[in-house]
Curated annotation (Swiss-Prot):
GO molecular function: magnesium ion binding; nucleic acid binding; RNA-DNA hybrid ribonuclease activity
UniProt GO cellular component terms: cytoplasm
PROSITE patterns associated with the record: RNASE_H_1
Function description: Endonuclease that specifically degrades the RNA of RNA-DNA hybrids.
Domain (RNase H type-1) ranges: 7-148
Cofactor: Mg(2+)
Compartmental location: Cytoplasm
Official protein name in the record: Ribonuclease H
Length: 153
C-alpha cells in the first residue's frame, strides 16, 4: 500500500498455498506485518488441493488477528482474488451454486473466508508469484514448510 499516512491499525499480510500433487499433501503460509512487528506461521493437510491451501492461508491469517484491522492481503492466487472480489456475491445470491447450477467448489472454505473478511477492512493486492516479491517468497517458503510438516516420505 502506498498511502502517505497509512491507518494506525494497518496489517499487511502475504499468503500462499502449496501442494505436492494436486490432490496431495499441501501447506499454507502467512507472513504478517504490523508496524515493526512481524509474525510467520504455517500449517498443512496430508490430502488436499492447492486451491484449498490458498484459501486456508488467508482464513488462518485473518483468524490470527485479535481485533478488527485494516488489512492489505497480498496473494499470488487469482483464484482467491477473483473469488473474493468477483465471484462471491453471485455465489451467495445463488445459494452457493455456480452459474451452471453446480455446487461451488470449496464452499465451506469460502464461507469461512467470507466470515473472516467481514471482521476487517480488507484490501486485496495481487502479486506475481515467484517473481522476487520478498513477502510472497517468504509466504511460499512457509507454505512449503506446511507441506513438509504433513508429507509422507
Amino acid at each position: 500500500m502506498s498511502t502517505a499516512n497509512p491507518p494506525a491499525d494497518l496489517v499487511e499480510m502475504w499468503t500462499d498455498g502449496a501442494c505436492k500433487g494436486n490432490p496431495g499433501p499441501g501447506g499454507w503460509g502467512v507472513l504478517m506485518r504490523y508496524g515493526s512487528h512481524e509474525k510467520t506461521f504455517f500449517g498443512g493437510d496430508p490430502q488436499t488441493t492447492n486451491n484449498r491451501m490458498e484459501i486456508l492461508a488467508v482464513v488462518e491469517g485473518l483468524r490470527a488477528l485479535k481485533r478488527a484491522c485494516t488489512v492489505v492481503i497480498h496473494t499470488d492466487s487469482q483464484y482467491v482474488m477473483k473469488g473474493m472480489t468477483e465471484w462471491l456475491p453471485n455465489w451467495k445470491r445463488r445459494g452457493w451454486l455456480t452459474a451452471d447450477k453446480k455446487p461451488v467448489k470449496n464452499a465451506e472454505l469460502w464461507q469461512l473466508l467470507d466470515a473472516q473478511v467481514a471482521r476487517h477492512e480488507v484490501r486485496w493486492q495481487w502479486v506475481r508469484g515467484h517473481n522476487g516479491d520478498p513477502g510472497n517468497e517468504m509466504a511460499d517458503m512457509l507454505a512449503n514448510q506446511g507441506v513438509a510438516s504433513v508429507a509422507r516420505n
